[in-house]
């Protein structure tokens, strides 16, 4: 055992042991409590960054701790391998996306191995492998057969240069992020999955997720956006269809002075067909992508269509406007405007000099309608038969009136829209559908799955390469045998990441999407990832789990029992990025200090949920601590080996009750730290675990070894320390555990038990304050009387109370504090 801590040698030795013993490969065991720990799998970008190191170390620490508790732990790893970066790399570097992806996976896997994470590598999966996405295609067809999948025209962001759909995030200042072209709003045919059919369950089952952050659950509630309101029907002059609008405030219906529709609403297009000015307005809105978050601050613009609607109660005509603040994707794409009681409608009315009709009277306050809208509830006025009703009552009465007159109905509305899964890209899972002129849409037969991406394609950067690949596109209809074409869209990559956690449980299953192993392992007991995934990925995964449940593939309602959302890694107060020049390279860190130092620092520097501020001095401090632990263990190696031999031979019993006072006191501290650290591990508060380990080490390194009992105490304490540190710094703990003669490998050692008798103490440390200021401290017996404690306090604080009158002595037992109040 070398006196000098060499992390590279230590870590190589530990990793070779784990690899040789297949230490982290796991199978189902009904005799053990299972624990499935999973960090969100990475996109293979080519290199790990410090955010990765923090995220995956968190998961590994949790998995190793749960294993030490005796549970059957699964911790897999894989690759979210489809996506736009690989396709862009293919265009730029003239290499196939698959080649670029495989190269990146190999590089990142090497980095993961160096970190020492306890992964079951036999379960490794890659979403771009046909054996993975085959079952995604199979499941999509099952959903199609159930009516949960459909294809329809939808308005999208279209890049006319790249000839592809862009996500909202890829539109920068109205231009395509790559081509720089002005983005158009274009209607094309898209595939959708009916997530709205599960909206109510997705919302209600959030209440069962007790171990999810409240913030994430609220974000999902807001995204689903359930509201109870009224659907109102307006007849339109010279137009065949009624205009449907949704409102949560039917009590303001009598104050509606105009209607507004979205720029891509069918009625707007109808008006534009014979009104040049309306068409010009629609054209001016074509390249503008309006995000919902921008509605409050953007300039409100519109134009009168010249068409009118009939108020369902008064029969009066209301002008219909096209407005840029009405979005087709929310509600029905039409709103009734009540300027007196909606601020957005009021601003629009002021700009275009439209009428403002007050129909709600504030209760006990005055309001100036020339300055703003009044948006709260009140008493109805100017509302004919509904006058003098409170808003709460009027909502019900007016809704009933509309229902009785076939002019509306009570309804529940959701902000959530069906999930559009089509992407006009190559590097994704092919959608397994065939389009036949005679038969329509026909699923690819199961026996022909997977539909594999062709390799003989050209990456020009314009349009989808699949559309130009005749061998891929031209097929025979499986239903009628006539010539047909294959669907050339690929899946949104969120589809792959919505079910991968379940496939990890069934790796190697070639004949089914999932098997009974998925029912054993799911739900995931602990899921770890960034809060930026709160809505999209986490919502889609919850949805997919319910779809798989209803197909009989899993038997739980939710995919992830507990969720930990880690904070970002910052340097100089900013997120690490190449452009800011504040990136820390994990490879350099591991080469210099070792993986254990990197792991220790990222666990110690901050609670998991908070941002971590990088500190070079903090890294050096973590490394110094590990060197001290190594040196101390080396210094006492022979003694510790002898004690181990005594214990293994049955001669290592110590009666701690008969030990001397100083040993009892130190042992009390060690077991106090053990109890607190175990509690902190259970709450994922690893920074305080590390702090406790440092206190424990200081206690034993300062302890004077004088008796045989002292040796057993040091042995017991180092055993506890190494097991407390092992989930966080597994390599050094593995080597020290073996070299100090402990039984088994430390990964198979049970979690240390708190000796409750050690927590009991004969003595208590008290601090003495004089007029609230700390002046002294002393040790007293646990059964000391109040009089004895006060006398001891006076004695130890003598210099501060002499020549003063002690007016009062206050004892605070739970804080072990005595405050002497002097005059």
Curated annotation (Swiss-Prot):
SUPFAM superfamilies, A to Z = Anticodon-binding domain of a subclass of class I aminoacyl-tRNA synthetases, Nucleotidylyl transferase, ValRS/IleRS/LeuRS editing domain
The record, for NCBIfam families, names: leuS_bact
Query: What is the similarity comment for this entry?
Result: Belongs to the class-I aminoacyl-tRNA synthetase family.
One example of a Gene Ontology biological process annotation = leucyl-tRNA aminoacylation
The residues listed in the UniProt record as binding ATP, with positions renumbered to this chain, are 578
* UniProt motif ('HIGH' region) ranges: 42-52
Subcellular location(s): the record lists: Cytoplasm
**Catalytic activity annotated for this protein?**
tRNA(Leu) + L-leucine + ATP = L-leucyl-tRNA(Leu) + AMP + diphosphate
Q: What InterPro entries is this protein classified in?
A: aa-tRNA-synth_I_CS (IPR001412), aa-tRNA-synth_Ia (IPR002300), Leu-tRNA-ligase (IPR002302), Leu_tRNA-synth_edit (IPR025709), M/V/L/I-tRNA-synth_anticd-bd (IPR013155), Methionyl/Leucyl_tRNA_Synth (IPR015413), Rossmann-like_a/b/a_fold (IPR014729), tRNAsynth_Ia_anticodon-bd (IPR009080)
Q: GO molecular-function annotation terms?
A: aminoacyl-tRNA deacylase activity; ATP binding; leucine-tRNA ligase activity
Indicate whether DNA repair appears among the record's keywords.
no
- Motif 'KMSKS' region: where? 575-579
KW Cytoplasm (keyword) present? yes
What EC number is given for this enzyme? 6.1.1.4
* PROSITE patterns per the UniProt record, alphabetical: AA_TRNA_LIGASE_I (PS00178)
Q: What is this protein called?
A: Leucine--tRNA ligase
Which CDD domains does this UniProt record tie to the protein?
Anticodon_Ia_Leu_BEm (cd07958), LeuRS_core (cd00812)
Assigned GO CC terms: cytosol
Q: Give the main location.
A: cytoplasm
Q: Which UniProt keywords apply?
A: Aminoacyl-tRNA synthetase, ATP-binding, Cytoplasm, Ligase, Nucleotide-binding, Protein biosynthesis
